[in-house]
A protein has these predicted regions:
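Short secondary-structure boundary/capping segments
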Residues: 1-4, 135-137, 194
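Metal-dependent phosphoesterase signature
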Residues: 39-102
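Substrate-recognition element of Asp-dependent hydrolases with the DxDx(T/V) motif
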Residues: 84, 93-99, 104-136
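Asp-based, Mg2+/Mn2+-dependent phosphohydrolase catalytic module
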Residues: 138, 143-228
Length: 228
């Protein structure tokens, strides 16, 4: 893992430098509101310890909550936007490049060359997705993708999100293959009619594939994979 630890560590410096910019300040207001309404005892305990108790008392007071969200893998949309901005900083100054498994770049280029339409659906913001593939260790891969989706299209555990994605791609869901490392996402995509595969990679937190086929090397993948 490179990107998430980098964003976590860089949060204080980034907010110190950019916290008053209007677009960042708007994101921080959304984070403040989410924190205020977060029912989790851990979040509220942090809030009690935070310096000041009102929005506008300083961007730095939000750092513990933002880091807590990262540590608990809570995909708050304004946090994802902030992470994307932090990664853009890191990519821009050469501090980071995006790591990919060794088989991924060749597979993406092969699929694109075969005329397959490629899309990304991630909890990370669309700009963050595009930055990742633009600054991969294997070069700029962003041009291989035709469509980009984040949680603004809907939650990844809801079948309706996948119906919307298929419509945006101009395809019937049955013509779409969705690959994920999360069983709940596979179930939702399958519920929308898509073919699905579990990406089984080292370090995946949950490798339960349920009734679905696994794949651990994209060089093994062919267009009919996952279709029943």
């Amino acid at each position: 893992e490179v990107l998430f630890p980098f964003a976590r560590q860089a949060l204080p410096d980034f907010l110190g430098r950019h916290g008053k910019r209007p677009e960042v300040a708007a994101l921080l207001e959304a984070v403040e509101e989410a924190w205020r309404n977060d029912p989790h005892p851990g979040a509220q305990a942090l809030r009690q310890q935070a310096p000041g108790n009102e929005a506008g008392s300083g961007a730095e007071r939000l750092v513990p909550y933002l880091q807590w969200l990262i540590d608990h893998d809570i995909k708050l949309t304004p946090l994802k936007d902030l992470q994307g901005r932090i990664w853009a900083d890191g990519y821009g100054n050469g501090t980071i490049t995006a790591p990919l498994f060794g088989d991924v770049a060749a597979a993406l280029r092969r699929w694109n060359g075969e005329g397959l339409v490629l899309a990304v659906y991630s909890s990370g913001s669309v700009p963050a997705q595009q930055l990742l593939y633009r600054h991969s260790e294997d070069g700029d891969l962003s041009g291989l993708f035709s469509h980009w989706f984040d949680t603004r299209v809907g939650a990844k555990q809801h079948p309706k999100s996948y119906t919307e994605i298929a419509a945006a791609m101009g395809a019937e869901p049955q013509r779409v293959l969705f690959i994920s490392d999360a069983l709940g996402e596979l179930e939702a995509a399958h519920g929308a009619g898509m073919a699905v595969l579990l990406s089984d990679r080292p370090g995946n937190p949950n490798r339960d594939s349920g009734p679905f086929e696994r794949i651990s090397d994209y060089s093994q993948l062919h267009p009919g994979h996952g279709h029943q």
